[in-house]
Amino acid sequence: MSSDPDKMMSKADKMTKLTLTRWSADWRGATELYEQAANGFRASNKYEKAKVALEKASKGQEMQASPWDAAKHMESAAALAQKLSIWNEVADFYRKASELYVECGRAQPASDALGKAARALEDVKPDDAIQLYTDACEILEEDGRDQMAFDLYRACANVYIKLEKFTDAATFFLRLGVAADKCDATNSQCKAYLSAIILYLYAHDLQQAEKCYNDCSQIDAFLKSDQSRSASRLLTAYNEGDIEEIKKVASASTVSNLDHMIIKLARKLPTGDVTAIQMNTNDDLDEDDLT
C-alpha cells in the first residue's frame, strides 16, 4: 500500500462511493486509510489536509456505529482548526464531538469538549465562549455532576468580567454557589457568594449587593462563615461611606483567598462615590420619617 497520504485519501474516498461494481461502501477500510492519511499529513505539517482527513475518519467511525472513536477524531480535527485559527470550525467540531460523547452516555468528556472550545474562543469570540461554557455546565448539571463544573462556572464568570458584564459574572458565581450547596462544598459555596457580592459592589449596585447578601444569609452555612462577615462589613462600610474600612476589608485574608479575578476587582473598591450612596440612603430614611 502506498504511504502517500494524498493517494490514501483518494483511495478511501472511492471506497465510500457506490458504483455499478460496488454496491456497499467499505467504511471500515476507508476509515483506516483516512486515519493513516491524517497521521501522514500531520507528520509533514500539512494541517489543513490532516484536518479534512480526521473529519472523514470521524464520519467513518460514525458509520461503523463507533461514536467514541468518532468523537476523538472530531476533537483532533478541532485542535488542528485551532492551530489554523479557523474559529468557526473549532466551535463546530468540538460541539460535534460533545454530541457524540453524549451519544455514548459520557457526560464528562462531552462537557470537556465544550470547555476546550470555550477556552480556545475566549479572546477571539468571547460571546461564543460564554455560550459554550454555559452548555458545558448544563451537561454536567443534568448528569448530577455539579461538582465537576466548578472551574467552568469560574471560567465563564471570568469572560464576563473581561467584557465588563459584572452582573452576569455575579450570576455565574451564584450558580456555582448553588452547585456547591448540592455537593456540600461549603467553602466553595461561601466564596462564590462573597464573590457575587463584590461584583455587584464593583458595578455600583449596592441595592443588589444587599439583596444578594440577604438571600445568601438564608443559608446557615454562609451566615456563620468568614465570607459572610466580610460581606457584612463591606456593606456596612458602603452605607456609612467609610472608604478606609472598605479598603481594609477588601485587602483582608478572606478576600485574598478568593479567585484572582475577584481579588483584582476587590482591590479597586470602592469604584463609585460612596458619599453619594450614603446621602441617598439618608434621603430614603428622611422620606420614611413622617414624625
From Swiss-Prot:
GO terms for biological process: intracellular protein transport; vesicle-mediated transport. It is a peripheral membrane protein. CDD domains: SNAP. Its main location: membrane. SUPFAM superfamilies: TPR-like (SSF48452). It comes from the Eukaryota. Transmembrane segments: none annotated. GO terms for cellular component: cytosol; membrane. Keywords: ER-Golgi transport, Membrane, Protein transport, Transport. It is found in: Membrane. Belongs to the SNAP family. Required for vesicular transport between the endoplasmic reticulum and the Golgi apparatus. Binds to SNARE complex and then recruits NSF to disassemble it. This is Gamma-soluble NSF attachment protein.
